[in-house]
Amino acid sequence: MGQKINPIGLRLGINRTWDSRWFAGKAEYGKLLHEDVKIREILHKELKQAAVARIVIERPHKKCRVTIHSARPGVVIGKKGADIDKLRKRVADITSSDVVINIVEIRKPELDATLVAESIAQQLERRVAFRRAMKRAVQSAMRLGAEGIRINCSGRLGGAEIARMEWYREGRVPLHTLRADIDYGVATAFTTFGTCGVKVWIFKGEILEHDPMAQDKRMNEGGGESSQPRSRRDAA
């Protein structure tokens, strides 16, 4: 089962928590969920060059707090905060709540599965040899402290007539072990030969305590992300 299921979904409530953190009754649930989807679509579209790994949405009383986890916070903020103010206004057009945007810096993007997958996909689009891109990502992750990493690339690799799947693994990636801290990311490369899919699993160690927030705490303590987020509040 652990080989097939999304490893993040399998560990929700054990050592990882949801990226949408709010509660609503039946009357508002659908509306708020649709807002979350639109907010994420807009932010990913506007911040293509900002290396965004996660977007966490929280809804305290009459507010919408959006936390953007990015490896390039300067690109998100812009000159004198101009870009983040534009983003806040775009998000405010979707939701009726007061909007607060926080930026959390990812200090080691080589250990974030989503950013690794997107990096490989971008290299495939630039016609970099897929084996070289995969090996480089594996070496970088292991050098920075990952206990294991696996990368799958599938599609018409290298322009081959027949699509196939190639994979590399170094270290161990225990997908069945629920206490394992495994990050998972996917990306799609749009090449002239068609689309190529990239999947990345990164094993960062074990989390022994039963705490849904354990992974976030561990990243802040271990230097994976800065513990002091930068914020821009709604002027209203």
Swiss-Prot record:
CDD domains with a match to the protein in the record: KH-II_30S_S3 (cd02412)
SMART domains: KH (SM00322)
KH type-2 domain location: 39-107
Alphabetic keyword roster: Ribonucleoprotein, Ribosomal protein, RNA-binding, rRNA-binding
Annotated Gene3D superfamilies: 3.30.300.20, Ribosomal protein S3, C-terminal domain (3.30.1140.32)
GO cellular component: cytosolic small ribosomal subunit
GO term, biological process aspect, one: translation
Pfam families: KH_2, Ribosomal_S3_C
GO molecular function annotation: mRNA binding; rRNA binding; structural constituent of ribosome
Spans annotated as Disordered: 213-236
Family per similarity comment: Belongs to the universal ribosomal protein uS3 family.
Record function comment: Binds the lower part of the 30S subunit head. Binds mRNA in the 70S ribosome, positioning it for translation.
Subunit details: Part of the 30S ribosomal subunit. Forms a tight complex with proteins S10 and S14.
Record-linked NCBIfam families: rpsC_bact
Stated name of the protein: Small ribosomal subunit protein uS3
Protein species of origin: Bradyrhizobium sp. (strain BTAi1 / ATCC BAA-1182)
Gene name tied to this protein: rpsC
